[in-house]
Amino acid sequence: MRDDEFEWDDRKAARNLRHHAVSFELARLAFADPRAIDRLDLDESDEDRMLLTGLVGDVLLTICFTERGSRKRIISARRASQREKTEYSEQNT
């Protein structure tokens, strides 16, 4: 995983860190989880967004992102909800 595979808005990253206590630098590591699951984000948006749930250390994170060419643009990152934890567990057993 290379740093140039990811991009984000620095102001949004700072807000996300304050609100969810998850940095985008940490969040990008979830993409390296070979058992990570991704799905289309069905929230209404003017762009196609994806959700990825992956393990970073012992913390399960959910990242909202979009693909821009060969790069992933991180939009938000947070600890996975109970439903997302269950889905991750079921997909990986």
Functional labels for PLM-detected ranges:
Residues 1-93:
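Ribonuclease/tRNase effector modules and their secretory precursors
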